[in-house]
Swiss-Prot record:
Molecular function as annotated in GO: glutamine-fructose-6-phosphate transaminase (isomerizing) activity
Gene Ontology BP, a term: protein N-linked glycosylation
N-terminal signal peptide: none
Species in which this protein is naturally found: Rhizobium leguminosarum bv. trifolii
Function: Involved in the production of the root hair deformation (HAD) factor specifically on medicago.
PROSITE patterns per UniProt: GATASE_TYPE_2
Pfam families registered for this protein in UniProt: GATase_6
Keywords: Aminotransferase, Cytoplasm, Glutamine amidotransferase, Nodulation, Plasmid, Transferase
Segments forming domain Glutamine amidotransferase type-2: 1-102
EC number annotated for this UniProt entry: 2.6.1.16
Protein name as annotated: Glutamine--fructose-6-phosphate aminotransferase [isomerizing]
Subcellular location: Cytoplasm
Note: The nucleotide sequence was reported in PubMed:1673458.
Amino acid sequence: AGVATISGGNLERCRAQGKLVNLEMRLEQQPLNGMIGIGHTRWATHGAPTERNAHPHIVDGIAVVHNGIIENFAELKAELEATGADFETSTDSEVVAHLLAK
């Protein structure tokens, strides 16, 4: 699970593996500053259910959460990597953030 907020034009993100209560505990320890944000609880379809793969994905100031499957993500990822995109996760959803950042 994860959440991203915006404060003063900057994105902040907090993610945690497992149950939503894990994210809640992390946010209690390290609160985010923003008052507007997006969040997601993830059911892994591509990529392991790890903190690194948790949404939101952030690329160049764009935060993305996604529910669903991107069928052609391998092809899109390869095309983006060929143009210099650096992927942090093994999820299909991260391609959306990279495409929007282009």
